[in-house]
UniProtKB/Swiss-Prot annotation:
It comes from Hyperthermus butylicus (strain DSM 5456 / JCM 9403 / PLM1-5). Belongs to the class-I aminoacyl-tRNA synthetase family. MetG type 1 subfamily. Its EC number is 6.1.1.10. It catalyses: tRNA(Met) + L-methionine + ATP = L-methionyl-tRNA(Met) + AMP + diphosphate. The lineage of its organism: Archaea, Thermoproteota, Thermoprotei, Desulfurococcales, Pyrodictiaceae. This is Methionine--tRNA ligase.
Length: 572
């Protein structure tokens, strides 16, 4: 049994996550964690609400409340939505949790004591109109490297370069739109150049995917610069360094350490305060991070540097799955323009399994992907229903009507039978290969392909005719078919957990499809002759043929219902 930490990027809870946030980290991480559990691995799956920093502070001021009132509502609501999406966290926590706050302060002091944190004056953006120092993300200007006119003060979303606000051309305040000034303020910095050699050695020897590894090595070629770890805003974890009164820890350093503190909190809940070290200090532990591509520098450079700089034997990232962007009907999701679908709106439209399946099929693994309602309709009606749902229903209904719900004894295998049995046995191995490469879209593709082969097999064998002329051949066909359905149930479990469990019950199989170690039964003939199946039901339901044309006109009413359910401080 292997030991794994599956880490999803922490959603920033100044708003409800949208579909792009969901597939970029949380859902992908959940599918992978569920797969590992099915394999019988020892898994801790962690994430939490990222709730510090100026964006939330500004939103709270706008609403006339303390930031914690806002994040209390947001955290509980988002946590509930993830539960409804069947996200199987072992611990979903928050950056306001006392365990996290204490851990961050202790960790940052270790970096300080080890000589990796130093103090110096910094020149920071200040908005004279709003009378406040601005966080990097609240400064917008032209990127000095690529000329992108909407680059942020910490990073250009176009070319991906990490920036300092002073590098931007024509910097402006994103709150009021006015020009910013730069004023001196004392701050504490993480000495990344001092750790560059160690980070580069680790990167070159790592098994990170090419998009992450190459991007990070290119950044190292330019040379790392010290990064400020403190901010002047009030809402955050107080900086622990001598003389740093009134400063808070920069939210990125705060949130990155959440993966460890969440594991620590998980151990405390289980009554074992040292459990987290059995994962994080064990060189055999594999740590897999699920993030969006814009977060690569923080996870592939800054986090490893922090872990190395601590002097403790932390295991460094084993794999970083960084997705490209999911667009919505050709444009980026936008809260201000109400452009996109947010996860509570999605659940108002259809149950979670439909979204889980469709989003994994659209997962932007190699390039930006466009969510369209027409593609969503095709996936639901063709792949979920025609390919998988229809096949399952054909098999179970035939056994119910022609064999009295009892799985028949097979006869000798024809070439077609042998070929289909081979497909049943080999599909889990192919899906497993894609899972190990964190190519979840392709793994789900193997599940769909097995169902397609099943439909073709039934059409070729025509058991509805053979039951009259060669009942033994029909029995063989249905014996193999029902076992392929059992394999489908196991393979679907990471993707559509509720539907997979319902299918397991329809097959009248013992226990839960989600039991640890269940994966080893995929591809095996686990349903024996004489087994009685349960009552067949429709696994999925089709959407109306004009769903993609009509959904736009229905969104306004859907959003009205959703807004009524949202906590008051999360209504737009």
């Amino acid at each position: 049994m292997g030991r794994w930490i599956v880490a999803s990027a922490w959603p920033y809870v100044n708003s409800i996550p949208h579909l792009g946030n969901l597939i970029g980290s949380i859902l992908s991480a959940d599918v992978f964690a569920r797969y590992l559990r099915l394999k019988g691995e020892d898994v801790v799956f962690v994430s939490g609400s990222d709730e510090h920093g100026t964006p939330i502070e500004v939103e709270a001021i706008r609403r006339g409340v303390h930031p914690k009132q806002l994040t209390d509502q947001a955290h509980e609501y988002v946590k509930k939505l993830f539960e409804e999406f069947r996200i199987s966290f072992d611990n979903y926590t928050r950056t306001e949790n006392p365990v996290h706050k204490e851990f961050v302060r202790e960790f940052m002091m270790k970096l300080y004591q080890n000589g990796y944190i130093f103090e110096q004056d910094d020149v920071l953006p200040y908005c004279p109109r709003d009378k406040m120092f601005l966080p990097d993300r609240f400064v917008v200007g032209t990127c000095p490297y690529c000329g992108f006119e909407k680059a942020y003060g910490d990073q250009c979303d176009n070319c991906g370069r990490l920036l300092h606000p002073t590098e931007l051309k024509n910097p402006r305040c994103s709150i009021c739109g006015g020009p910013v000034e730069f004023r001196k303020s004392k701050h504490w910095f993480f000495n990344l150049p001092k750790l560059q050699e160690k980070v580069e050695k680790w990167l070159r020897e790592s098994n990170l995917p090419p998009n992450v590894k190459n991007y990070s090595l290119n950044m190292l070629k330019e040379g790392l610069k010290p990064r400020s770890v403190t901010r002047d805003n009030k809402w955050g974890i107080p900086a622990p360094f001598p003389g740093a009164e009134g400063k808070t820890i920069y939210v990125w350093f705060d949130a990155l350490l959440g993966y460890i503190s969440a594991t620590k909190e998980y151990g405390l809940k289980k009554g074992d305060p040292e459990l987290w070290k059995k994962y994080w200090f064990n060189p055999e532990t594999k740590t897999v991070y699920f993030i969006g591509k814009d977060n690569i520098p923080f996870h592939a450079i800054i986090l490893p540097a922090m872990l190395i700089g601590s002097g403790d034997p932390y295991v460094l990232p084993s794999y970083i799955s960084a997705t490209e962007y999911l667009m919505y009907e050709g444009e980026q999701f936008s809260k201000s323009r109400r452009w996109g679908i947010w996860i509570d709106e999605a659940l108002e439209i259809l149950p979670a399994d439909y979204w889980r399946f469709a989003l994994i099929r659209m997962r932007p693994e190699a390039k930006d992907t466009n969510f369209t309602w027409s593609e969503f309709l095709r996936i639901v009606n063709t792949e979920m229903n025609d390919d998988i749902g229809n096949y399952v229903h054909r098999v179970l209904r035939f056994i119910e009507s022609k064999f009295g719900s009892v799985v028949p004894e097979p006869g000798s295998y024809s070439d077609a039978d042998k070929e289909f049995e081979k497909a049943i046995r080999e599909t889990p191995r192919r899906a497993e290969k894609y899972f190990e490469e964190v190519r979840l879209k392709q793994a789900l593709g193997e599940v769909i392909e097995l169902a397609r082969k099943g439909n073709q097999y039934l059409n070729t064998k025509a058991p509805w005719d053979k039951i009259k002329t060669d009942p033994k051949d029909a029995a063989t066909t249905m014996y193999l078919a029902v076992n392929s359905v059992a394999t489908l149930a196991i393979l679907l479990a990471p993707f559509t957990p509720d539907s997979a469990e319902r299918l397991w019950k329809m097959l009248n199989l013992p226990g839960s499809v989600h039991e640890p170690g269940r994966w080893k039964q995929a591809g095996e003939m686990i349903i024996k002759p004489g087994h009685r199946i349960g009552k067949p039901e429709q696994l999925f339901r089709k959407l109306p043929a004009r769903f993609d044309k009509e959904i736009a006109s229905k969104l306004q009413e859907i959003r009205r219902k959703v807004m009524e359910k949202r906590p008051p401080l999360l209504r737009w």
